[in-house]
Amino acid sequence: VVIYPHPDDESFGASGTIAQYRKQGVPVTYLCGTLGEMGRNMGSPTFANRETLPEIRKEELINACSKLDVELRMLGYRDKTMEFEDRRQVAEHLKDILEEIQPSLVITHYPGYAVHPDHNAMGAAAIEAVRLMSPANRPKVWAQAISTDYIKELGKPDISNDVTSVFEQKMEAILAHDSQASGIIGQFQKNWGIEDMNEAARKQLGKEQFYIWDFRE
């Protein structure tokens, strides 16, 4: 089970790992907290506005999950408000879903090292949800840190997953989020040109790194 707050978090953050698990026949479910409806990116060139963005991002999310062949569950929280939600309530909500699915692994953001307040809040709630489960039934948690200083603060990640074997599928999932990815891809092209862009993207996105969460009190 992958738990992130926004459409595209799954594609940029863990789609290579997801694709590898799916190739092994492991079912994957994405619990997406919000529709990212308060995002600033409206496509490049612009094709969305504040009114149309929620529906556009929802369609992009469905498309990305289809490319990754994962089950999608949209949790219905409001974008940019996760930090103000009652963490225990969100954790209980997630716990109920996890107890239904019974996954062996949860991937989420590392609280405090995930840049965006929604990332930190959803990661904290996901880890709390697993903590609330019976120790005998707890899945492993892989927490993803993305802040600039995380290696200095946390040390080397426990898992560094080379996803170059499924890189094309990862890029398909990223590009499905056109309203968010088009500006980033355009910047790559502008800075490096097409071939160099592919190499730069592969270098930047070809590894997915995680810390194994330690639940020992």
PLM feature segments, named:
Residues 1-101, 128-137:
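Active-site rim/loop-helix segments in enzyme catalytic domains that contact anionic ligands
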Residues 1-3, 24, 71-73, 80-217:
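Metal-dependent de-N-acetylase/amidase catalytic core
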